[in-house]
Amino acid sequence: MSRIYGMAKMAYQAIRPFRERQMACRVCNYYKDSTDREVLEVLEYIKKNKTMKSFNYPFAEKYRHYRCPLRKDRKSGLFLTKYHGHQMYFSRDFFTSSACVNYMRSILTEQDPESPHRYLTDSFDVDEGSVVVDAGAAEGNFSLDILEKASKLILVECNRNWLEALVKTFAKEIAVGKVEIVPKLLGDHDDHSHVSIDFLYQKYGKIDFIKLDIEGGEENALRGGVKWMRECPAAKLAVCAYHKPDAFHYIWQMLENQNLFHLSYTKGYMYFPAVINDQPPYLRRGLIRAVRRQQVNRSYE
């Protein structure tokens, strides 16, 4: 396995610089007539560096050589690190230290205060005592960041390898009932592998904040949460809007049609590389933030 992994990694590393340069040229050509200042800022960075990354801004450079402290749990065999003062486990998919380090670099980059992927800000945050749904929990970094603020955390994650890691990361909180893990995909219906926002709302009686980062399933998840959106006066949402080319438009329209929310989006653009064939728009907004209008008594970014 390690030999196959090593060969695959070498092949990917060999082709990656070419692909990044190719995409840099394609993106610059696609946006050559743009007058959007934020687009022009990205293009300037791309032209200067002659490459295309997910985050084409100077802030990303400070994590390029970041090294996180790692150790291996003897009992489970999983790698773990310290994340903002908390122990955080990696899934079994990360079976080399270099893979763990690269993953941590990506987490820190996407949650940098200047990142288009940043979930929270000083003015858009989880309130003390909130019940929070972390959909697409993965390694659990979002939940760890708000662990002290939230009264309850509901982690929705369908990847079995991440489930094992999450149970280790949140063992103490699970034991006292502060954290519950739902091993399903958040969607617009309920069955053995899917769960809806409205089902969780009915089960727990209160949900104040939902983070949606579910690899393109955000629209379906919102369709399954109409009752919650209409009935919860404290509702807040942080919704990833870049996984599909048209995601931003549809998610914004869906939330706007509810006529309930103050909507905003994160500053800047990010590039989300497709597995097979990249489709425009190549530069996409990272997140849409939604706050029930009753709560808007101050400025949200």
What are these regions (language model features)?
Residues G136, K211-E215:
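Conserved S-adenosyl-L-methionine
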Residues D145-K149, T169, A221-W228, Y250-M254:
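A short acidic, amphipathic alpha-helical/loop segment
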